[in-house]
Amino acid sequence: VAYSVQEVPIEFVNRAWPDVEKFITTSVEYADGEFTLDEVKARLVQGSWALVVAVDESNTVRGVATVAYYNRTDHRVAFVTNFGGKFVSNPDVFSQFASILVSKGATCMEGAVRDSMLRLWARLGARKKSTNIQIIL
């Protein structure tokens, strides 16, 4: 199955929400309380995060990613905040996704992932960069 990957313009996030919500819901379950579904939607409609979808030939959403961009001294980072569905299914989908990130100025992509996602991403060239910790104060 061939997928087309495209960024959803901010003015269409609300219209796209019913088609992407189920994918994001699954991803939020693994976020360990970092954000809720409502917070994801708020960040998308406010433009803090970008929404990227993979659609099939009939324009049905098959995968979703949300991305937050930020700048470091040596990179413009595209930090993937959510993945859901068939988004990382093959090199072609990733290539299309990477092209979108580059078009937004990104020089690298990062994300916080479970071990199973790391194994999946490793097939596309990802490497483990660090391990995050958290202490509630």
Language-model-detected regions and their locations in the chain:
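Short amphipathic alpha-helix that is part of the acyltransferase structural core
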Residues: V1-F35
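Active-site rim helix/loop that mediates acceptor-substrate recognition in acyltransferases
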Residues: E29-W49
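Long, low-complexity, intrinsically disordered polar/charged segments
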Residues: A31-F35, V61-R62, R72-T81, A98, ...
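Structural motif
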Residues: L44, E57, S99-L101
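Conserved donor-binding loop and adjoining core beta-sheet/short helix segment
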Residues: Q46-V88
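Short glycine-aromatic motifs
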Residues: W49, R123-K128
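Acyl-donor binding region in acyl/amide transferases
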Residues: H75-L124
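Conserved catalytic-core motifs of GNAT/GCN5-like acyltransferases
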Residues: A112, R127-L137
